[in-house]
């Protein structure tokens, strides 16, 4: 990976960009994953590169739903494995959820490489999706394959950085679907039951914190959080945040105000 000086004003953005490139070079991330990352980065600019209140609200509801679930599953793709492998394992443990590798551009080599990356952080972790035997109805070819003991039987599924038709297909199967997507206009964002509009590198650590904080909540408290959540309002609030932020920036001006030395 390219050595980026920490003094660089865009250090973290460049760092995670390099992680995605490294993921592709290792064989985990598909070429299309780089395009998807760039699109997400553009929306991160728009929201201000921070966790906004609608995302925090969505994360609390998502964690509550997972803590209530009987068969929770977290899906892992190439971008997730490249960006947050350690945090993915921490989140699965905090939510008592299973991990399943589920890929749009599936090859056995990619699956094996992603599993190896995850096991660097926990050699004993159970990873599903290695030999899937079931298929999501309506999804053809490799990308429709799921594990019988994972997504196939899950009641609640977290599908971060996911494509819209698979999100929709899971909802049609009766799954409660949570997604992490920086684009509030994407089909995944609009199809999911809970949409966390945040960068996954911020969202997963925060969800781990919330899971540890909320694990002792009563069932009634968790049900109340889920019951009061409105995903339509969350997405609308994200769009309003972007609108208001852009309006404020336009009014204040974004051009440099002084001569450079």
From Swiss-Prot:
Keywords: ATP-binding, Coenzyme A biosynthesis, Ligase, Nucleotide-binding. GO terms for molecular function: acid-amino acid ligase activity; ATP binding. Its EC number is 6.3.2.36. Pathway: Cofactor biosynthesis; coenzyme A biosynthesis. Optimum pH is 6.5. It comes from the Archaea. ATP binds at residues 17, 39, 181-183, 187-188, 199-200. InterPro entries: PPS/PS, PPS/PS_sf. Disruption phenotype: Only viable in the presence of CoA or 4'-phosphopantothenate. Activity is not affected by 4'-phosphopantothenate or CoA/acetyl-CoA. Disulfide bonds: none annotated. Activity increases with temperature elevation from 65 degrees Celsius to 95 degrees Celsius. It is an enzyme of class 6 (ligase). It catalyses: (R)-4-phosphopantoate + beta-alanine + ATP = (R)-4'-phosphopantothenate + AMP + diphosphate + H(+). One of its GO terms (biological process) is coenzyme A biosynthetic process. Pfam families: PPS_PS. Homodimer. Catalyzes the condensation of (R)-4-phosphopantoate and beta-alanine to 4'-phosphopantothenate in the CoA biosynthesis pathway. Cannot use (R)-pantoate as substrate and thus does not display pantothenate synthetase (PS) activity. Displays strict specificity for its natural substrates, 4-phosphopantoate, ATP and beta-alanine. Belongs to the archaeal phosphopantothenate synthetase family. This is 4-phosphopantoate--beta-alanine ligase.
């Amino acid at each position: 990976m390219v050595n980026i000086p920490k003094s660089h004003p865009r250090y973290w953005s460049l760092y995670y960009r390099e992680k995605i490139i490294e993921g592709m070079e290792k064989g985990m991330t598909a070429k299309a994953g780089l395009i998807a990352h760039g699109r997400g980065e553009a929306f991160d600019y728009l929201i201000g590169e921070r966790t906004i209140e609608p995302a925090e609200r969505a994360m609390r509801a998502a964690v509550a739903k997972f803590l209530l679930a009987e068969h929770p599953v977290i899906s892992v793709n190439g971008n997730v494995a490249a960006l947050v492998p350690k945090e993915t394992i921490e989140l699965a443990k905090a939510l008592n959820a299973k991990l399943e590798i589920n890929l749009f551009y599936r090859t056995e080599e990619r699956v094996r490489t992603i599993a190896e990356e995850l096991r660097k952080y926990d050699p004993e972790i159970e990873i599903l999706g290695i030999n899937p035997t079931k298929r999501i109805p309506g999804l053809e070819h490799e990308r429709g394959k799921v594990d019988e003991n994972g997504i196939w039987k899950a009641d609640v599924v977290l599908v971060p950085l996911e494509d819209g038709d698979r999100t929709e297909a899971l909802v049609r199967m009766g799954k409660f679907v949570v997604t992490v997507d920086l684009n509030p206009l994407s089909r995944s964002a609009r199809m999911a039951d809970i949409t966390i509009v945040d960068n996954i590198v911020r969202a997963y650590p925060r969800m781990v914190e919330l899971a540890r904080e909320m694990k002792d909540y009563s069932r009634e408290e968790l049900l109340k959080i889920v019951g009061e959540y409105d995903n339509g309002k969350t997405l609308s609030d994200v769009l309003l945040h972007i609108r208001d932020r852009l309006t404020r920036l336009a009014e204040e001006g974004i051009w440099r105000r002084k001569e450079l030395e």
